């Protein structure tokens, strides 16, 4: 047999041996994750924005599982907070003061200054920025969560975070908060004829 064939066979056998060894080790030393953390993470919006004070949604889910409050996710809003509270069996609370006091903002790219580097596209966790290399980029404001992660990587500083103004499309009407007075109907007397 040639030395080349022997080397190939030997390396194949070594790769097979170490593959089986790694597979066995992966099964033997598998670390089971906390299933509640996985459920909490599935509820969170996965923007990885850090507005909750944690570096991403997974660390915040782990903190909630360890007893942290469920009202720290501004992009998720009240609906996410209520789902988290029901899963954890705690009373829903209003969003924390920081989340409520923040005016919703969206990214705005000054397109005449954009060099098309795509760094903001790569940084956006929700794919709210569209564009291509060496072409200008723009933000889909309906999809932007205002996480601010696209501002820092921009080399020409052409991204601003602008507050979203109230208009008919995004106004919070609070229809369930309008006071309604129920009037009981009194029975009418039958007409005598």
Swiss-Prot record:
The keyword DNA damage does not apply. Its EC number is 7.-.-.-. It holds the Pfam family Fer4_21. GO terms for molecular function: 4 iron, 4 sulfur cluster binding; electron transfer activity; metal ion binding. [4Fe-4S] cluster 2 binds at residues 114, 117, 120, 154. Binds 3 [4Fe-4S] clusters. NCBIfam families: PRK05113.1 (NF003475), rnfB (TIGR01944). PANTHER family: ION-TRANSLOCATING OXIDOREDUCTASE COMPLEX SUBUNIT B, OXIDOREDUCTASE. Part of a membrane-bound complex that couples electron transfer with translocation of ions across the membrane. This is Ion-translocating oxidoreductase complex subunit B.
């Amino acid at each position: 047999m040639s030395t080349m064939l022997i080397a190939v066979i030997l390396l194949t056998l070594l790769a097979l041996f170490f593959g089986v060894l790694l597979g066995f080790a992966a099964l033997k030393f598998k670390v089971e994750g906390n299933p509640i953390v996985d459920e909490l993470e599935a509820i969170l919006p996965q923007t990885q924005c850090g507005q909750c004070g944690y570096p991403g949604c997974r660390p915040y889910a782990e903190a909630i599982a360890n007893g942290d409050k469920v009202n720290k996710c501004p992009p998720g809003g009240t609906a996410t907070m209520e789902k988290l509270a029901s899963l954890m069996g705690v009373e829903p609370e209003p969003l924390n003061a920081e989340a409520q006091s923040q005016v919703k903002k969206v990214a705005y790219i000054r397109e005449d200054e954009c060099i098309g580097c795509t760094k903001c596209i790569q940084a956006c966790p929700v794919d709210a920025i569209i564009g291509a290399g060496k072409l200008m980029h723009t933000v889909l404001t309906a999809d932007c969560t205002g996480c601010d992660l696209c501002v820092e990587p921009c080399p020409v500083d052409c991204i601003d975070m602008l507050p979203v103004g109230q208009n008919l499309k995004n106004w919070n009407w609070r229809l369930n908060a309008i006071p309604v007075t129920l009037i009981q109907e009194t029975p009418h007397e039958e007409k005598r004829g």
